[in-house]
């Protein structure tokens, strides 16, 4: 069972996270930022991951610590749950339409952190979320998971749809990267010998 339980406590946030990689898209999520919760719910459903997440952050200061730390913790949970990464596909990509918006995501669970995100969001706030923090979430995940994360919105009108399509595409790309390949069950997907 590819599962992880993680508690991450700092002076800025207190996070409890439970992850089941091979889940059914069930979630219980509370970060104190409703639009962010909604995006994380979409992430779990489209990735078919089961996630329980509670975060108490210093939202009276700013949303940054909450959003970034959730990304870091989620990335760390995937690293923990996947263990040696033996037999996984390692990389995945997905092209996600969301009405008039199209987003592309690619993920490589390479053991190296790198990210590039272009959501083309043109407003400061969507719902109750500071939109610049979308990048911080994906960067945090990349750092926590030691993964390459690339997301690009190709086009779209609605800023809500641009963010939503990004989270959905990311979830589905990550789902493929985590998938097992029975032919390579005892093979590490790297010529270096480690990830």
Swiss-Prot record:
GO terms for biological process: L-histidine biosynthetic process. Pathway: Amino-acid biosynthesis; L-histidine biosynthesis; L-histidine from 5-phospho-alpha-D-ribose 1-diphosphate: step 6/9. It comes from the Bacteria. Pfam families: IGPD (PF00475). Its EC number is 4.2.1.19. It is found in: Cytoplasm. Its main location: cytoplasm. One of its GO terms (cellular component) is cytoplasm. PROSITE patterns: IGP_DEHYDRATASE_1. This is Imidazoleglycerol-phosphate dehydratase.
